[in-house]
Amino acid sequence: MTAALPDLSFHPAWHAQLELAYARAGDATRPVTRRHAGPLRVQKHLYAEGPEVCQHILVHPPGGIAGGDSLAFDVRLGERAWAQLTSPGAAKWYRAACPARQTLEIHLEPGATLEWLPQESIVFAGAQAELETRIQLRGDARLFYWDMVALGRPASGERFASGHFVAALDIRRDDRLLWHERQRIDGGDRLLDSPIGLAGHPVLATLVASGEIDTDLLQRCRALPCAGRGNLSQLPGGLLVARCLADEALHARAWLIELWRLLRPALLGREAVPPRIWST
């Protein structure tokens, strides 16, 4: 049975901001700024791997994003700080008569490491979701970033027949552009089923990591089983980019996690320890 969508006819728009900053103090990473306005919060503050890696679980208590809403994240890491940011569940973008927006600004100083590992975004039919991410790396800062998007509700048989999804991603190192991407997917567009588009897969995922790996590890990553279509490329400028198309978000998530398990020791020098929230 398909669950009814919430009635958002009289939904008051939420304008939420979350500003986070981290600094290295001795052998530990400490949060030095944690400011919020509106319904964006840090739910938990953890050191599951010891003091060097600060893990924060970010939550949006309303549980969904509707027309007129805006969410803004600003994340800054000082030299040699290490933060891992994730979420407890999927972000839901509801159908709406006007756009809802999310912006993410990331600034990493030399030697800093950020793992941005949220769970998926579900963009319901009729939603107007617009996301913009800008990342600035300084010196030898390290990044491990992913995002997953489910268009419609595949598990309920709901296609993305109306609305739109727009996403932009810019990554720079010392102001030099390393990666620029802008995509727009309109509900009902032929590209949803075209072999040069999503080929009928309603879930798309992207992983971007800074650094270079040897040919053997690259082949091991490419050999990982994927319940969909997945591949990984080493790009000039020291970026690894992985793509996945899948029929369900859990399949894309499983593939990204396995990639992270393989790549984290090579790129970040630590074994992969999955956040416990992923298992709840």
From Swiss-Prot:
Gene Ontology cellular component list: cytoplasm
GO MF annotation terms: nickel cation binding
Keywords: Chaperone, Cytoplasm, Nickel insertion
Pfam families: UreD
Domain of life: Bacteria
Subcellular location: Cytoplasm
HAMAP family: UreD
Quaternary structure, from the entry: UreD, UreF and UreG form a complex that acts as a GTP-hydrolysis-dependent molecular chaperone, activating the urease apoprotein by helping to assemble the nickel containing metallocenter of UreC. The UreE protein probably delivers the nickel.
Protein name according to UniProt: Urease accessory protein UreD
Source organism (scientific name): Pseudomonas aeruginosa (strain ATCC 15692 / DSM 22644 / CIP 104116 / JCM 14847 / LMG 12228 / 1C / PRS 101 / PAO1)
Gene expressing this chain: ureD
